[in-house]
Design a protein with these regions (language model features):
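Conserved cytosolic headpiece of P-type ATPases
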Residues: 1-148
Length: 148
């Protein structure tokens, strides 16, 4: 569960929210865009996540598992399947339900989700690169001469 203004600690698949299942996220720290992005609940999940603000903290009424594709760098694709009721109910997830690590929840009181990727497997971490060591041409030549 994340609340308004929180930064997502991992890549999370959205299950429900205080805002009729959907939410807005701010990704300016990731891609520089100032516009809020809308994320929507998968159709049909609302019946499983009938949560109110009053009973949110102790909610544990849904049992199932989420299968997701192998971690990849593409920020604009995501595929996953949520299995509920012992696998008899399946719900497909896409990029419209993915809350990226490092993004912030905005204009939505709370969201509930299932962690899809953590640590080095998050899309942002897969896209991060180590900084290059920068040196001038002259410094490189001097280093070679010092070695000989």
């Amino acid at each position: 569960m994340c609340e308004d203004g929180d930064t997502f600690p991992a890549d999370i698949a959205l299950m429900t929210s205080s805002d009729d299942g959907g939410c807005f996220i701010k990704t300016s720290s990731l891609d520089g865009e100032k516009n809020l992005k809308k994320r929507i609940q998968v159709k049909g999940l609302k019946a499983y996540f009938d949560v109110t603000n009053a009973n949110l903290k102790q909610y544990n009424g849904v049992k199932g598992h989420l299968e997701v594709e192998q971690p990849n760098k593409d920020l604009h694709t995501f595929k996953g399947t949520l299995y509920l009721d012992g696998g008899s109910k399946m719900f497909s997830f896409s990029q419209d339900q993915l809350l990226l690590k490092g993004a912030n929840l905005a204009n939505t009181e709370w969201v509930v989700g299932v962690v899809a990727y953590t640590g080095e497997q998050t899309k942002i971490m897969l896209n991060s690169q180590k900084g290059r060591v920068k040196m001038s041409h002259l410094e490189g030549m001097v280093n070679q001469l010092v070695i000989y």
